[in-house]
Amino acid sequence: MSSPATAAAAAASCGVLRHHHPPASPRPPPTTTTTTSRLLLASRSRGLQRPLRVNHAPPRRLPPTAARAQSAAAAGYQPESEFYKVEAILRPWRVPYVSSGLLQMGIRGVTVSDVRGFGAQGGSTERHEGSEFAEDTFIDKVKMEIVVSKDQVEAVVDKIIEKARTGEIGDGKIFLIPVSDVIRIRTGERGERAERMAGGLADKLSSAMPIS
């Protein structure tokens, strides 16, 4: 039986020198600490001012109640405008109640027009004075348009809802449209002075002043 030295000499005599290395042990999987250290070294080698931070925590999600509260706050946004046109689509037989309520507020400039249409809830039935109307056919409605100052918008909307609501499908809708300016044709007045033709805030303030 040959010794290790004899085997090495025999291999060298054949012109081939063989080195026997022990098998390499498997590397352990990288840990979170190892990965973080590598990222920190990479960030420093790139000359970053701040080391790269690794956050392994799951992303924070808002609870449903907080999300709804944020949506409600965003829904109250109104574009900046001095005047607004309040456009309401109403049942014809509710118009006298709405106009009477607006007159009590001092709103006199109202434009109404007869329109026809149906809502997105096609196929439902609207009842009035014992008769039924299918909402998939055009129904007679009244469009009421009022131009008021910004300070009066909420009061006018609340009054229309109070007088026009029945609680059934088909009560209508209200649209708020910003108005850039108001011009009186007869005199050429603009802005607050011309808004008096709509029974607006300027008209109410001037009528409330005592006559000396």
Curated annotation (Swiss-Prot):
Any GO MF annotation of the entry: enzyme regulator activity
Main location group: plastid
Cited Pfam families: P-II (PF00543)
Renumbered residue ranges of the record's region Disordered: 1-74
Presequence extent in this chain: 1-68
UniProt-listed SMART domains: P-II (SM00938)
Amino acid composition bias (Low complexity), ranges on this chain: 1-12, 32-46, 63-74
Keyword terms: ATP-binding, Chloroplast, Magnesium, Metal-binding, Nitrogen fixation, Nucleotide-binding, Plastid, Transcription, Transcription regulation, Transit peptide
InterPro entries in the record: N-reg_PII, N-reg_PII-like_a/b, N-reg_PII/ATP_PRibTrfase_C, N-reg_PII_CS
Gene3D superfamilies: 3.30.70.120
UniProt binding sites for Mg(2+): 119
Binding site for ATP: 117-121, 170-173
Keyword Membrane: no
Location within or outside the cell: Plastid, Chloroplast
GO (cellular component) term, any one: chloroplast
A biological process from GO: anthocyanin-containing compound biosynthetic process
Domain of life: Eukaryota
Subunit (UniProt): Homodimer.
PANTHER family: NITROGEN REGULATORY PROTEIN P-II, NITROGEN REGULATORY PROTEIN P-II HOMOLOG
Family per record: Belongs to the P(II) protein family.
Function: Participates in sensing carbon and organic nitrogen status and regulates some steps of primary carbon and nitrogen metabolism.
Protein name: Nitrogen regulatory protein P-II homolog
The organism of origin for this protein: Oryza sativa subsp. japonica (Rice)
